[in-house]
Amino acid sequence: MGLARYLQAAGVEVIEVDRPNRQARRHHGKSDPADAVEAARAAHNGRVQAVAKSRNGKVEAIRTLVVAKRSARQARIKALNQIRHLSFTGPDELRARLAGLATARLAEQTAALRPRPGAEVVAYATRVALRTLGRRILALDEELAALNELLAELVAAAAPQLLAVHGVGVDTAAALLVAAGDNPERLRSEAAWAHLCGVAPLQASSGKVTRYRLDRGGDRQANQALWRIVMVRMSTDDRTRAYVERRTKEGRSKREIIRILKRYVAREVYRLLSRP
């Protein structure tokens, strides 16, 4: 990504190739040199025309915080699962003391444990391990709080119009901004944005039946963000609930309705991103 920034700063047009041509891979196999050659050919012959993200503004700063937040969240979940496992398999006294505690209380209780050096070796080691994991969770909670605060400030500065949309929170807006990049004008059209988010309808018709299916490609974080917006609106927005009811009566499945709604939301978001 540093190379792309350097070339863009020098006035060189940088084309982004998301993935190698699958047909070429089937014929020639997979290797880094072959993928590089195929990417160069795709950019040279115009088959791929996506302009690379500039990665030099607020959105790139947001992306770095999102990476750190995702890592901290995953580490917290992992530590919590390890605490539950150790407390379940540990000595009876610890298991009884920690059973049924809520997550926050569990972290506090384990972080406050005092291992006794003269105790039986398994009990002592288990207390040390639980205390270590409990303190790790509390430290990660502080990290997440600091990251959330800074992330909220950056998202509000980068796209206040996005936060005003019904169903859009800081994390959702951050995912959509990262997908678009610091230079959303690189997106050729609203349809290109929908394809990037994995909500472009794909034909799945057969015979006289005309239908579409979900797109499994695209940016999965942006796709998940659109899904969260739709879920919020299906629960709290009267227009969306009326639409779902009408479509259900027409025979549409819930999955199809969600796909259509995600496409509508993608169109709404694109207009906000392209005209801040």
PLM regions and their residue ranges:
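A detector of single, family-specific signature residues
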Residues: 1-276
